[in-house]
């Protein structure tokens, strides 16, 4: 039996891919280190970064995550991928990346990641992100996507969040 969350995830990715009219071609991958390094590239390869941007047709950008947040962005001319964990939220990698895009045409897609229902954190992180945390039953949880969603709403940027949790979804365990 196929899990309904898996179907949602595949549908989410297919919607995004069809919007970008992707074809098979070259791939650019990242050695992700929870940094704030954003690179604009034009050829395939392995890069030391947590965000890649390209204008090169048929160059596929790869982002790998477990519980971190994969974000795909495009303004119709450029496309980018971002790997964001709590360190990425702290060092504002999303905002550093979108500075290189035309905000008036920007579209943001947030993929499956640890959601606020399950991403339990300790007091030190709770204090670092007071607007992106919740407390329930004496436990503290981080909402990784909250800052991005808030920004997109304020700037009227089109965004989509898969809302699939990689911690409690059967598709990821």
Task: Give the ranges of each region predicted by the language model.
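Active-site microenvironment for binding and transforming phosphate-containing groups
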Residues: 1-173
């Amino acid at each position: 039996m196929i899990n309904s969350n898996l179907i949602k995830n595949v549908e989410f990715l297919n919607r995004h891919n069809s919007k970008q009219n992707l074809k098979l071609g070259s791939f650019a991958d990242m050695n992700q280190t929870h940094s704030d390094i954003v690179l604009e590239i034009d050829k395939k390869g392995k890069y030391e970064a947590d965000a890649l941007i390209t204008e090169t047709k048929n160059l596929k950008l790869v982002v790998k995550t477990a519980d971190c947040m994969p974000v795909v962005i495009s303004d119709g001319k450029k496309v980018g991928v971002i790997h964001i964990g709590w360190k990425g939220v702290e060092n504002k990698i999303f905002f550093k990346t979108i500075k290189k895009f035309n905000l008036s045409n920007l579209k943001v897609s947030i993929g499956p990641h640890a959601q606020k229902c399950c991403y339990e954190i300790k007091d030190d992180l709770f204090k670092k992100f007071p607007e992106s945390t919740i407390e329930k039953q004496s436990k503290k949880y981080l909402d990784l996507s909250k800052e991005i969603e808030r920004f997109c709403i304020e700037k009227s940027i089109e965004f989509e969040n898969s809302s699939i949790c990689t911690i409690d979804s059967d598709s990821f365990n």
